[in-house]
From Swiss-Prot:
Residues 116-125 have a biased composition (Basic and acidic residues). Disulfide bonds: none annotated. It comes from the Eukaryota. This is Large ribosomal subunit protein eL24B. GO terms for cellular component: cytosol; cytosolic large ribosomal subunit. The modification Phosphoserine is found at S50. There are 2 genes for eL24 in S.pombe. One of its GO terms (molecular function) is structural constituent of ribosome. It is found in: Cytoplasm. Belongs to the eukaryotic ribosomal protein eL24 family. Keywords: Cytoplasm, Phosphoprotein, Ribonucleoprotein, Ribosomal protein.
Length: 149
């Protein structure tokens, strides 16, 4: 047994009861009685009529039991190790004194600067060497051109 719902009042429409209204755009409306159909055709708002299900739902009528508020899950911070660092190592670093940490940072910076300076000086040496060889090659070319003339 298929029980329909009234398009206006929201009440149940049992088989063999109620009225069916088909609009020009083929939208079907089911009404429990002539009263609902008439009010629908008058374009009355069912939320403003106190006997409709929509009104009762909107104004929280007939809800007998007060159900408890839904509890939201709280996020809990949890520490765990990451790739390349164990949890013990992380805790140890966190518990270090600021002076020790600053000294370690300064040492790491100095090491990085020294490494960069070394690589730059190496690049300069290679560049100077290639420039000298290209200058020598250019001088030989110039000498050959001068010899032809």
């Amino acid at each position: 047994m298929k029980v329909e719902v009234c398009s206006f009042s929201g009440s149940k429409v049992y088989p063999g009861a109620g009225r069916l209204f088909v609009r020009g755009d083929n939208k079907v409306f089911r009404f429990v009685n002539k009263k609902s159909e008439s009010l629908f055709l008058q374009r009355k708002n069912p939320r403003r009529l106190s006997w409709t299900v929509l009104y009762r739902r909107m104004h929280k009528k007939g809800i007998s039991e007060e159900h408890a508020k839904k509890r939201t899950r709280r996020t809990v911070k949890h520490q765990r190790g990451i790739v390349g660092a164990n949890l013990d190592v992380i805790k140890e670093k966190r518990n270090q004194r600021p002076e020790v940490r600053a000294a370690a940072r300064a040492a790491a910076l100095k090491q990085r600067k020294d490494k960069r300076a070394a690589s730059e000086s190496e690049k300069k040496a290679i560049k100077a060497k290639s420039a000298a060889s290209s200058a020598r090659g250019q001088a030989i070319k110039n000498a050959k051109v001068a010899a032809r003339r």
